[in-house]
Design a protein with these regions (language model features):
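Conserved ABC transporter NBD signature motif
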Residues: 70-78
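A short, proline-enriched helix->beta-strand linker immediately N-terminal to the Walker B motif
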Residues: 170-174
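Conserved ABC ATPase "signature" region
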Residues: 78, 129-146, 255-256
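A short, surface-exposed alpha-helical micro-motif characterized by mixed small hydrophobic
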Residues: 218-220
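ABC ATPase NBD coupling module
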Residues: 21-25, 79-95, 121, 241-246
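Conserved ABC ATPase signature
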Residues: 151-155, 159
Length: 263
């Protein structure tokens, strides 16, 4: 299968605040020499506890932060070498769905305005074409077009998450990074959104990196799974291999913690 994303020896360090100016500078490694590949049209899971580095990796892919060292290749090209035009295209091709959809929506603007603003920034379509595109993507995420006249605070958490997904997909990206996309939702709503994501991924043929601390969600949704712990990649395996012998010790601990919560 053709790869869309390749990460080579990625490290991200942050300075640790000093208690005294006389202390030597110390660094915390949020990512430590991480290497992996993501294949085109797959759903790739990044799982780990809080502080594992999974969200840091997502931000690096989106160019929201700059790595300390290492490379990220998109379609075979180092994203740090992009010129202005290539970066503009990359911003369309790679989209993000945040954990808190409310924070990614303008509370003072109607949903329709927010969706069409995204198209406007990307210089896609005329005003009438943008309206039709907004109506279509809302139907695809199982929302009525009339929601375009509503404000974010008039919607439920599940509805706002659907709008967040619509906002990412309206520009027809090649890669979507979803960071804890269902963790704030009720279990029943989680299931609805996960099923919707599966359907949308098949319809739009986008690659998805799904970031979560929940191994149950990751195992249900993803084709392959990468496990991170303290910034270090523990292993990468196919989802159906989760319960096989030979998993890394940290993966086993994650799995045991999930079983304890279910008891």
């Amino acid at each position: 299968m053709a790869e869309i994303l390749r990460i080579e020896n990625l490290t991200k360090e942050y300075k640790i605040k000093k208690d005294s100016i006389f202390e030597p500078t110390k660094y915390f490694k949020a990512l430590d020499d991480v290497s992996l590949t993501v294949n085109r049209n797959e759903i790739f899971g990044l799982v780990g506890e809080s502080g594992s580095g999974k969200s840091t990796l997502g931000k690096a892919i989106l160019k929201l932060i700059k790595p300390t060292s290492g490379k990220i290749y998109f379609d075979g090209k180092d994203i740090e070498t992009f010129d202005k035009r290539e970066l503009f295209d990359y911003r369309r091709k790679v989209q993000m769905v945040f954990q808190d959809p409310y924070s990614s929506l303008n509370p003072q603007k109607k949903i329709g305005w927010s969706l069409m603003e995204i198209l406007g920034i990307q210089k896609i379509g005329t005003k009438q074409e943008r309206i039709k595109m907004a109506e279509k993507i809302l139907e695809d995420v199982e929302m009525r077009p009339s929601v375009m006249e509503q404000y974010p605070n008039e919607l439920s958490g599940g509805q706002r998450q659907r709008i967040s997904i619509a906002s990412a997909l309206i520009v027809e990206p090649e890669l979507v990074v979803i960071d804890e996309g269902v963790s704030a939702l009720d279990v029943s709503v989680q299931a609805q959104v996960l099923n919707l994501l599966n359907e949308l991924q098949e319809k739009y043929n986008f690659t998805c990196i799904f970031i979560s601390h929940d191994l149950n969600v990751i195992e249900y949704l993803c084709d392959r799974i990468a496990v991170l712990h303290n910034g270090v990649l523990q292993e990468v395996f196919n989802a159906e291999e989760l319960f096989e012998e030979g998993r890394a010790e940290y993966t086993k601990k994650l799995f045991e913690s999930v079983k304890m919560k279910l008891r």
